[in-house]
Amino acid sequence: MAWGWWKRKRRWWWRKRWTRGRLRRRWPRRSRRRPRRRRVRRRRRWRRGRPRRRLYRRGRRYRRKRKRAKITIRQWQPAMTRRCFIRGHMPALICGWGAYASNYTSHLEDKIVKGPYGGGHATFRFSLQVLCEEHLKHHNYWTRSNQDLELALYYGATIKFYRSPDTDFIVTYQRKSPLGGNILTAPSLHPAEAMLSKNKILIPSLQTKPKGKKTVKVNIPPPTLFVHKWYFQKDICDLTLFNLNVVAADLRFPFCSPQTDNVCITFQVLAAEYNNFLSTTLGTTNESTFIENFLKVAFPDDKPRHSNILNTFRTEGCMSHPQLQKFKPPNTGPGENKYFFTPDGLWGDPIYIYNNGVQQQTAQQIREKIKKNMENYYAKIVEENTIITKGSKAHCHLTGIFSPPFLNIGRVAREFPGLYTDVVYNPWTDKGKGNKIWLDSLTKSDNIYDPRQSILLMADMPLYIMLNGYIDWAKKERNNWGLATQYRLLLTCPYTFPRLYVETNPNYGYVPYSESFGAGQMPDKNPYVPITWRGKWYPHILHQEAVINDIVISGPFTPKDTKPVMQLNMKYSFRFTWGGNPISTQIVKDPCTQPTFEIPGGGNIPRRIQVINPKVLGPSYSFRSFDLRRDMFSGSSLKRVSEQQETSEFLFSGGKRPRIDLPKYVPPEEDFNIQERQQREQRPWTSESESEAEAQEETQAGSVREQLQQQLQEQFQLRRGLKCLFEQLVRTQQGVHVDPCLV
């Protein structure tokens, strides 16, 4: 054939599709524009017939510029900018054994002589003011000084956690508003809840994960509502950059410790006899009647066997003046026909009433001896009333109604308890529904929840989650740091044995107490009781913290091993840029009078960067380049700087809450209502008729001078408020205001 020598049609060689590719750079440098591919137009070839000629002249085509979805707003830089890195180390968490239910940041500045320090979870709040205070404590260093540079740009932070040898940790951070805390913040940080969170950072110990890096690095961008522009450092010094939450956990043995064979815990609650005798002010009755009424309930006449509540190893030592006698067995023994003596404490017999079946003393005589012991013990307290507050006879340490003879668990027979109830709690049966916890004042006489008197109710969550950090948050919520000695905790839980729940009255609460309180010891199990406590021995939060800690630790993923301390160390690095328009200063000193050192160029004092408090940075505190007029400072600048008064920080003792601790979040509308209520109380804007009527009701005998001074103070208060409002308005017009949700 004629075409036999032709080769057969073969496939085209495969080649990669053309792409722009990625710009590979070995060293970071300024990015360049990607090359634009030339657009190729292919001519269409007609398969049939001759191509037709165009009958008109085609115009030039233009590409219309696409409309941008957003524009970039540029801001002119100040005359001088300095990049600054703030680097330092700090403990992210320190927890002594027995303080796991507490918040570490709330107890960061505690002065503890003896006992556990810190807490099992931490809620940090970082700001520029906090970093400045850490620098004053020599905990960090700044690569650039902010002196005379009042502007700032924030770029973010980097945190590096160093893994602990034997403790795991769970870390979360928050950069979305609102950046404050609420009553559910601490319960959400329980390890059982933290493990269920979506954005968590696990920091395993070296035992849990022997291999891998020894550090965990986290990059945290600026807050979501934070606009990237120049701010005055004075305006953002107390701005929350981010919140950091840390909690200690156990990822190796999350449910049961290898040191025990049981997940249940046991604690004690007050018996029903105390329900109407909980008030420390004794109610409306006098002290003698109050004691008699309680003893009649504890030792009724018609129930002689009920006096076995005194069958403890502490009764004879406490009720000793006069001595409360018990049955003494004869030396001859019980006899041939008996194995035990007739009154035997091992069988729950009332050993303080009967002796060989004969009643030696009545319940009335026992009540009189106990009351006499209270009076004799209280007499010594009255003698020392110059150095201590008296308290009351009913609340004496060794003889009161909450003394060891009534509440001590060291009994002859545990089946016959005192005025308490042993409760067993299993966290795996707790579904949360029906659980309640709240706080009652020590002046409240009963154990029933009352919305008008009880505070901080939490309900329908597992008990070990609700109690986590509950006391520390109550101090923030009430702004009362002495709350631990002024309130008591009550709870209801239908998942215990026996059930701490009354079907007919769900508001019926139970008062738990620690084992050391029942034994007459301090919360740290110290047998010595201070003098100021000997007339005020009643259950409050300090005597309940041990029970709260045990319930919280019983939950999943909590560290249950007995360790003296658990700690997590971290290193942080914040990225800022300082800016401003400082004046050029040139200080010339006589070179002949300069000091000398052993080595030229060196010294025994290390050089440090001078850091200025951001609160005192601004145009009102220093001179700027625009203040110079003909090489001299202008009169307005001199007046502006001279009006600022220097206040020493040592004049004030400081706040009771550390600045780095997470504060309570106050909604804007609630904050406005509080301010309005305060303004209404101060009465700066009331009408003349209202002010005159209130003035007549408050004081009619006041002099004209006092009224004028009061009006002058109100005018000063009004002036300060208007000045603050005007400053905020000016910041808003200048565009340097901060989002209120970030403050």
UniProtKB/Swiss-Prot annotation:
It comes from the Viruses. Residues 665-706 are annotated as: Disordered. GO terms for cellular component: T=1 icosahedral viral capsid. The keyword Protein biosynthesis does not apply. InterPro entries: TTvirus_Unk (IPR004219). Its main location: virion. Keywords: Capsid protein, T=1 icosahedral capsid protein, Virion. It is found in: Virion. It holds the Pfam family TT_ORF1. Signal peptide: none annotated. Belongs to the anelloviridae capsid protein family. Self assemble to form an icosahedral capsid. This is Capsid protein. It comes from Torque teno virus (isolate Human/China/CT39F/2001) (TTV).
